From Swiss-Prot:
Its EC number is 3.1.1.29. It comes from Listeria monocytogenes serovar 1/2a (strain ATCC BAA-679 / EGD-e). One of its GO terms (biological process) is rescue of stalled ribosome. The record marks D91 as: Stabilizes the basic form of H active site to accept a proton. The keyword Cytoplasm applies. Keywords: Cytoplasm, Hydrolase, RNA-binding, tRNA-binding. The lineage of its organism: Bacteria, Bacillati, Bacillota, Bacilli, Bacillales. Monomer. Signal peptide: none annotated. The record marks N9 as: Discriminates between blocked and unblocked aminoacyl-tRNA. GO terms for molecular function: peptidyl-tRNA hydrolase activity; tRNA binding. Belongs to the PTH family. This is Peptidyl-tRNA hydrolase. It catalyses: an N-acyl-L-alpha-aminoacyl-tRNA + H2O = an N-acyl-L-amino acid + a tRNA + H(+). It holds the Pfam family Pept_tRNA_hydro.
Amino acid sequence: MKLIAGLGNPGKKYERTRHNVGFMVVDELSFRHQTPWKKSKFNGMTSEIIVGGEKMILVKPLTFMNASGECIRPLMDYYNIPIEDVVIVYDDLDLPVGKIRLRQKGSAGGHNGMKSIIQHVKTQEFNRIRVGVSRPLKGEVINYVLGDFPKAEQPDIIAAIQKSADAIEDFAQTPFIEVMNKYNQK
């Protein structure tokens, strides 16, 4: 069993923002597999998919970004999912829009959702997919990440969401290091 957490903020006003690209990836997986979202007792929405016989629990924390770990850790404990079977999907300002990077460990890199998860799981050594949203040319980062993708960037971000979902489906049957090597080369 795997736990796939897409990071974002709950609520309609955040739905299409850069900061919610993690939610968009797990929504894509739920859509592909036609599985419903249900409110969990761990302050998140969950959906279960089966890929190649492997159950994957998709989760969208409802804690708001900065407290994502408060949802992830209890789900790991409840389902008895080891850290190596967890993937966190989140937005990354340091990658161009539409690029993805898979990693098995690393710092939070200034991302508050990742800081919360690292604090709650007590390690930086877990799988992650960083989805590029680029940096603003000028202005505040907060307003930028809470803004929607402009029309010109939508084809690139849709492709990144698809590619991230493909990588997660591959992870159902393939060690993450191999998935990482495959998708980081593209």
